[in-house]
Amino acid sequence: RLGYLDIIEFKSDEFEWIKLAYQHIHDKPTLVGLPSSVGLYHPPFFAYLLSIPVSISTDPKFVTGFVALLNLTGLWLLYIFAKRVFSLRLAWVVVSLVATSPWAILYSRKVWNPDCLLPFMLVFYITLASYLERPTGFKVWIMAALLALITQLHMSAWFLFGPLFLFAVLVKAPLSIRDVLIGGLLFALLYTPYITFHVITDFQNLNILSSLERPTIFSRSNLASAIDNIKWTYVISSGTGLSYSLGNEFDTFYRTRYLTLPYVFFSIVLFVAAFGTIRYLVLSVRWIFQRREWLDTPSSTKILILFTLILFLMHLAYFLFKVPSLPHYNVIFYPILFIIAAKVGVDAYKKASSHYIKRALLGLLLAILCSNLYVT
């Protein structure tokens, strides 16, 4: 993540984000970020975040290094989260997978708002796991503030509210009206600059959404986008699909770098993640409809149910709201599929009755990690 910062992608958007951060420090407060792919302005939090390194230097390598450091912090947070909720063994496996994954590295070293999602998502998940074990109002406030920051980093995070609400209902979260109101006020407070911009501009930018021509829900193009978004969720959690980033030179790169064997292991990761998703989706449905006692349910099971709700309901929302299929729209799902794949692998290792099977599974993990590092 911190190596070869001189070959990072740095084009107009990256320059404009640094420019906004610089203006925020030296000129006037930044109220909005850059326009999104649908024309709606991003909220300004990413510019505020970049103002930390920009206050020292505007060198693209330095600012990108800051983003990479944030993501290294994200790996540490992932270790804490996985160890606390699941096990030490799973924590090491999932951190190894994320640390070496080509796509995860790609989305951790660029001056781009989606590249900063992972550490904030993990702080949110850690706080949520703590709340499930010991509910307090203060943790609700922290989660509300984190959601305000996460939704500012990328608008796809707005679709998190559906699965989170359903999850809160399922686990019968002891939310008081007071805590919800305070959390809502904190959320609104962190959106004050963005709201201010829209008020002083008579909400002209918001009118763009109503004027956009979008396909109908059940049109062929929207169905194709929905399917592609599901594919991208799994592709960017493996090493497949790198042709999207390497472009026209990918075929030559593929042949000259002998990528056939690594792609076999990438496909295995993709298959295990897909299998794990189906497995935990079925388990979640059974658990919900059997009306198990949630107080006696392990935190790890609750978190896996939340993850399946996020995967299912967010992709349903992508379909209903006609979200175009782009890989960075699926960074919001990090590190869910890595955890699911690691859980399947660790469970298989525990249940293996033969030392040969256990050694084979360890060898497979090592081959996957080596393939990740080789391609990276």
Task: Give each language-model segment a name.
Residues W17-Q23, W158-F289, S300:
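Transmembrane-lumen/periplasm boundary regions of multi-pass, lipid-linked membrane glycan transferases
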Residues L2-Y4, F15-Y48, I52, P215-R220:
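Extracytosolic helix-loop segments that constitute the early lumenal/periplasmic catalytic or substrate-binding loops
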Residues R84-F86, F124-I142, I150:
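Membrane-interface transmembrane helices that cradle and orient dolichyl/undecaprenyl
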Residues K139-H154, F165-L166, L186-L189, H315:
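Membrane-interface alpha helices of multi-pass inner-membrane proteins
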Residues L166, L185-A188, G345-T376:
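Signature aromatic-anchored transmembrane alpha helix within multi-pass, membrane-resident enzymes
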Residues K11, W103-D115, M155:
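Short acidic/glycine- and proline-prone juxtamembrane loop motifs at membrane-interface regions
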Residues Y107-S108, L117, K302-Y349:
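Hydrophobic/aromatic-rich transmembrane helices and adjacent perimembrane loops
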Residues K61, G65-F86, L122-V123, T127, ...:
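Transmembrane-helix motifs of polytopic, lipid-linked glycan transferases
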